């Protein structure tokens, strides 16, 4: 999907694509997607601000790069959620802290230039986060909580609902740490919500906020 903008067998694509599925995501118990992607995707590197978190400024903030293209703040590496570009206002670069594991069904990473399809922000490649969906009727809830050294707390939850033609996904996270030295405190709130309605077998409408 990321390489052609329509559904295509990955074996028929002329570019290099890595896919990280839900099973791989769940095995890591990481609140952020980026450490997992760094391990699973060749050529993708991320740097954090400290013990956790990435920030959005230059200097102390972290960044993402793919095949050497990116930096701090991240430029030349496009991040999509369900195919929609993610920019931080006038800064024009993605917000690394917003990409949480609970919202992702799978992640597709196109490694290499993709500016013909996606514009100049995709010089290094494209990361497309495909969000989770509730396939069967009913309600599903998930929650993960972790606590460790330096008063570090990591929490995530998700709620997925499907009733008839209506479906919804809501995820949230709260992470904090005191850090291993003074002035290293970090606190982060995150959330994602998506509402959808099936008009027919082939037509669906949805709205989301991150």
Feature roles, as predicted:
Residues 1-26, 34:
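Short, acidic, small-residue-rich periplasmic hinge/interaction motif at the N-terminus
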Residues 4, 51, 112, 130, ...:
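Outer-membrane beta-barrel pore domains and translocons
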Residues 17, 25, 37-38, 107-109, ...:
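Non-catalytic regulatory/gating segments with a bias toward low-complexity or hydrophobic composition
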Residues 35-84, 105:
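Extracytoplasmic beta-strand/coil segments of soluble accessory domains associated
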Residues 63-65, 106, 126, 140-144, ...:
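Membrane-embedded beta-strand positions in outer-membrane beta-barrel channels/transporters
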Residues 84-111:
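Short acidic/polar hinge/loop motifs at secondary-structure boundaries
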Residues 105-106, 125, 131-147, 167-172:
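Transmembrane beta-strand segments of Gram-negative outer membrane beta-barrel proteins
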Residues 147-176, 181-210:
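Transmembrane beta-barrel wall of Gram-negative outer-membrane proteins
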């Amino acid at each position: 999907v990321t390489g052609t903008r329509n559904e295509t067998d990955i074996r028929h694509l002329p570019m290099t694509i890595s896919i990280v599925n839900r099973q791989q995501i769940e095995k890591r118990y990481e609140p952020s997607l980026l450490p997992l992607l760094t391990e699973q995707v060749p050529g993708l590197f991320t740097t954090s601000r400290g013990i956790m978190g990435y920030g959005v400024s230059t200097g102390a903030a972290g960044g993402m790069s793919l095949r050497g293209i990116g930096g701090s703040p991240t430029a030349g590496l496009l991040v999509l959620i369900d195919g929609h570009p993610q920019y931080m206002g006038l800064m024009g670069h993605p917000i690394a802290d917003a990409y949480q594991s609970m919202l992702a069904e799978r992640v597709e990473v196109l490694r290499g230039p993709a500016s013909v399809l996606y514009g100049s922000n995709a010089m290094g490649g494209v990361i497309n986060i495909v969000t989770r969906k509730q396939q069967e009727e009913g309600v599903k809830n998930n929650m993960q909580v972790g606590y460790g050294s330096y008063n570090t707390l990591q929490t995530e939850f998700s709620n997925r609902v499907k009733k008839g033609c209506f479906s919804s996904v809501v995820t949230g996270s709260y992470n904090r740490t005191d850090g291993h030295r003074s002035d290293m405190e970090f606190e982060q709130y995150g959330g994602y919500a998506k509402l959808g309605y099936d008009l027919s077998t082939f037509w669906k409408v949805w709205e989301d906020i991150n």
